Amino acid sequence: FDNKSFIYLILGFFVCGWHISLIATHIPVYINDRGLPEWCTVTILSMIGLFNIFGTLTSGYLAQKFSKKLILSVIYLTRGLVIAVFIFSPPSTFMAIFFGITFGFLWLSTVPPTMGLVGFIFGTKYIGLLYGIVFLSHQIGSFFGAYLGGVFHDLYGSYDYAWYISIALSIFAGLIHLPIIEKQVKRLQTT
């Protein structure tokens, strides 16, 4: 844990987990709270599933060609923008579908560049363990996104604070990836 780039990846993937679980867990109630028809929830989740395929494949392809840390920064910052547009726009079925498509494209698009960075920086010998640690952070973020989304809704009758935190976390994750050093760490030679 003495490698700052590794810590940045862990922190960034926490944000990914927060977003995924907040949306997957709470979008049905959020859509209902906004007065939209129930079919919007199904459509959003379906669009997320469908466009996730394209987003993840695109991200993986781009991660072979360009800076993985910059790809991650763009993904997280774009997530924040998409969330902001969605929550600050008047409720409409168009915006719900737009959100499902755009967030679907971004959904798990963080995985290829994150795993690619872990493998590139640290090598593949311990990639299972190292990526497992990064993924643990994702799952902790998932817990907090799902749990605190419900807490905020119960306390305040809306998801506003959960969404505001999501936007702030997007900015944080977008920035925290920038100082990652995309070069292999030196290995100690054993004799």
PLM-predicted stretches and their roles:
Residues 2-61, 145:
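Extracytoplasmic gate region of multi-pass secondary transporters
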Residues 14, 46-50, 77, 132-140:
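Transmembrane alpha-helical cores of Major Facilitator Superfamily
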Residues 31-32, 62-63, 148-157:
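Interfacial helix-cap and linker-helix signal at transmembrane-aqueous boundaries
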Residues 38-39, 124-134:
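Loop-to-transmembrane helix entry/capping segments in MFS-fold secondary transporters
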Residues 46-52, 58, 63-117:
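C-terminal transmembrane helical hairpin of 12-TM major facilitator-type secondary transporters
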Residues 118-127, 157:
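Paired intracellular helix-loop junctions of major facilitator superfamily
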Residues 151-169:
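A membrane-interface helix-boundary motif in multi-pass transporters
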